């Protein structure tokens, strides 16, 4: 099975991202920061949060569907709010998407919030609500559990451990543990928004998972588009039942301010 994990940055690098996604050949794609704006009349809108302004690909989810016609999609918004075209507000949704090749049966699933709760107003208060998605699949003649989370962003603490992040890790672990059965191959991935020494990873290790990013000696998971000093945010963890054949933190082409994580097993 070939699995891709990526924080897609709201499609900011759309011109590079879409052809790369279309041709990468992943069976399962776990994507964070996916934008879905039903009925949007423009390709690009703006996200505005005080001085922070970022272009967003308005119909990103639909465009992903178009370049992945052989995949089923599950989309789970963490929040909804407004994007902007000049002074015109456009309602939009923002969250997680998982694309699964149609030849791979989805035999179980669970979604839930790991921080806060869904808000349909202004994407929720800071730190924004965050959710996780867990799928149980039948692939390579056996059951797999694939889980993804987009960890909370804390402007004050940066990527340091906080009580909120500890609670988030407990909820993510509970979602995984609630769906996985003994003997399942388990993959947990995402933009966890924490450092390599975080208690988030220690909590997931108690599920029998080990991280391939730090374990593989990679220098980080952020691209040149990200200018802050912390170079780690994204992780991909597996249990002993996952027969890892290849794992890579992909540095080129740049399709986001995060590097894609690629697993073949």
Predicted regions and their residues:
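Membrane-proximal envelope and lipid/glycan-remodeling enzymes
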Residues: 4-5, 79, 147, 154-160, ...
């Amino acid at each position: 099975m070939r699995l891709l994990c990526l924080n897609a940055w709201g499609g900011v690098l759309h011109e590079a991202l879409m052809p790369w996604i279309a041709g990468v050949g992943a069976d399962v794609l776990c994507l964070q920061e996916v934008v879905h704006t039903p009925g949007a009349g423009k390709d690009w809108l703006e996200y505005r949060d005080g001085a922070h302004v970022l272009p967003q690909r308005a119909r990103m989810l639909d465009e992903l569907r178009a370049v992945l016609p052989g995949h089923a999609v599950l989309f789970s918004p963490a929040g909804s709010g407004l994007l902007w075209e000049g002074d015109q507000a456009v309602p939009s949704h923002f969250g997680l998407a998982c694309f699964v090749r149609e030849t791979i049966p989805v035999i179980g699933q669970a979604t839930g919030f790991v921080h806060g709760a869904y808000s349909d107003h202004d994407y929720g208060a800071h730190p924004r609500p965050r959710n996780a998605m867990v799928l149980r699949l039948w692939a390579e003649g056996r059951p797999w559990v694939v889980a993804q989370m987009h960890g909370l962003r804390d402007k004050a603490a940066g990527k340091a451990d906080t009580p909120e992040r500890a609670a988030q890790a407990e909820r993510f672990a509970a979602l995984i543990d609630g769906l996985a059965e003994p003997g399942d191959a388990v993959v947990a991935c995402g933009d966890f928004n924490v450092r390599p020494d975080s208690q988030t990873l220690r909590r997931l290790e108690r599920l029998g998972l080990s991280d391939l990013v730090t374990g593989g000696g990679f220098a980080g998971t952020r691209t040149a588009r990200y200018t802050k000093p912390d170079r780690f945010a994204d992780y991909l963890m597996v249990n002993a039942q996952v027969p890892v054949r290849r794992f890579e933190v992909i540095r080129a082409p740049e399709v986001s301010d995060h590097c894609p994580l690629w697993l073949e097993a």
